[in-house]
Amino acid sequence: MKIIGLTGSIAMGKSTAADFFKQAGISVFSADETVHQLYKSKPILSLIEHTFPGVVENGKVNRLKLSKILINDSEKLQTLEEIIHPLVQEKEKEFIDTARQQGKKIVVLDIPLLFEKKGEKRVDSIIVVSAPLAIQKERTMTRPDMNEKKFSFINAKQMPDEKKRERADFIINTGKDLENTHQQVFSIIENLLKN
């Protein structure tokens, strides 16, 4: 079974590309979705509330409050990552084990910080989703609760797009229309199934 890492900086179109893989019948593990699921778990909620008092409201993590804390304190960001990342990797391993048992030929791991967290060692090939900076910024600024400071903070935590592209086995350029992105995904799937 081939394990493919799908990565890209914020607002590059990674989720759209992941959806196209799913539509083609490829199993996709989403690190972000897994984090959101973990945030609903009572033990994790308790741990987050204990570590970051006031960010859990009505049984949910207030992600806006949490992000405001993390933007201003890199040690707290590291603390959160130490809590969450091992649990995400555990879920990733379960996903891979299940896919192997099901006889899948290819699986995709959608991991935003694949390079930054040394995840490239866990995959056979890497796909980087990329778009021109102007498009990336335009997409980012349409997100709720996004501003220049938060955009700069997130970008600073991520490897520059050009470096990711240099390390990629495949690049999906999402700067054009959705049909173009879909065709690129389809071509990559064909290539992976042949080799």
UniProtKB/Swiss-Prot annotation:
- Pathway membership of this protein? Cofactor biosynthesis; coenzyme A biosynthesis; CoA from (R)-pantothenate: step 5/5
Q: Which residues form the DPCK domain?
A: 3-195
What are the subcellular locations of this protein? Cytoplasm
SUPFAM superfamilies reported for this sequence: P-loop containing nucleoside triphosphate hydrolases
Could you tell me the keywords of this UniProt record? ATP-binding, Coenzyme A biosynthesis, Cytoplasm, Kinase, Nucleotide-binding, Transferase
* E.C. no: 2.7.1.24
Tell me, which GO biological process terms does this entry list? coenzyme A biosynthetic process
Q: Which InterPro entries match?
A: Depp_CoAkinase, P-loop_NTPase
The record ties this protein, via Gene3D superfamilies, to: P-loop containing nucleotide triphosphate hydrolases (3.40.50.300)
Q: Name one GO molecular function term.
A: dephospho-CoA kinase activity
Leader peptide range in chain numbering: none
Question: Major location, coarse class?
Answer: cytoplasm
In terms of superkingdom, the source organism counts as Bacteria
Annotated catalysed reactions: 3'-dephospho-CoA + ATP = ADP + CoA + H(+)
Q: Which GO terms describe its cellular component?
A: cytoplasm
| Residues holding ATP | 11-16
Keyword Nucleotide-binding applies:
yes
Q: Which family does it belong to?
A: Belongs to the CoaE family.
Q: What does this protein do?
A: Catalyzes the phosphorylation of the 3'-hydroxyl group of dephosphocoenzyme A to form coenzyme A.
**Name of the protein in its database record:** Dephospho-CoA kinase
